[in-house]
């Protein structure tokens, strides 16, 4: 029996950092596909990564403080545990970067990278896009990632984007890429080859014929022929390519049908006899008693009289299947050619039935439309489902007349995209406010209604109705409004927010999203005389953007 030594992640990473430092392969970026692991890996580094004569360890704390002092509420940031922990890492030449960080702290890391103070950066893949930094080595702590549904291997273009960070243009002649194979399960040679040298990502349009698109066209003066505008988009080119592919496929099928026909014409068994056998094969499984016995007897008689009938009938069956497939391609081609027109017409019908648009001329069956009052309201909404919200606000909620500002905040929080682990997921039953709960259920019902409409009409508007509403921070956001001083805010973040495993950065983004939604409604109500609703909406920003929950930036 042999002893097998299993290296811990901490040991592997420390050995690697020492190796890179000795061979002057720093600065490096280590890609980690988990926010929690980013901070754990960074904290586990104990070997020195800074140069022997580096002054970073003594000066970085002062420089960070000087940067933070640009903010009016800098003292609140200086006392944050997240800030203190980050500075401790920076003093060792280590940085972290992920989307769950407080935006200001993330910007500090980016500034420190540009100053070359960070020798090893632990980051998620979001850092691979859009940020310039001096990196010699790219480290992969894993070659798999969770894509929101399943754990999967990196795609070739994702790997290339991250690995391409190694080596600075015009400075380095070579970039190093390190795979920590002893930190993850071994891959097959085929999987490795696919990741390193797979098929490049195809450029696919994410353009959708949506309600917002149609509303914007109407808002900007277009009243008819909406499909003509959409045909200028990239999706039109994709449709044309799909049509070419279908035509090519039909041509190949037609040639194959022609070849089959020639064989059948010279076959020993007449075509009508083959069809009779195929018909018997279809009805025998569904027949019983006397009818089944008669059908089987007829089949045996045909097989006895025509020696090659089995093979000849098989060819006829193949021919029939090819003709069916050819007809299916014709139908798909027809639908594809008229896709844009049929989609825009269907959306127009939905907008008409939802009282969002009306015909320009009531006396004729015109295909020209204009926005109704509810439609004008909907055309100014982009953060939420324009049809559902405009109909509810105008037809049922009397322009938020019975909502308090806190209830509005709770309502808007349903449309934030915060991610909470399954063990902390909440449902509508967790909402204490009965009035707000009732209103949210109205939104749910309309989501079901429009989801069914789109499904029945084969529409693809790009709206994910299953995940459109979430209830995880409804109570949190309303409770946040009650925090009136720094101590209460700090305690709320360290208890209520932390207890749900929500990062301060994610909670900040959610509060900013609520403010964005509120500002959208403010722009709408500024054009009307509804001062009561406008006043309630104007209170939202000051109620939730406080303490470190702000839109401040060090780059401005």
Region spans (language model):
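Conserved segment of the helicase C-terminal RecA-like domain
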Residues: 133, 137-192
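Conserved catalytic network of the ASCE P-loop NTPase/AAA+ motor domain
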Residues: 20-24, 86-88, 112-115, 131-132, ...
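Conserved C-terminal RecA-like helicase domain
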Residues: 1, 8, 13-17, 31, ...
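Non-catalytic terminal extensions of ATP-dependent helicases
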Residues: 90-91, 95, 100-103, 107, ...
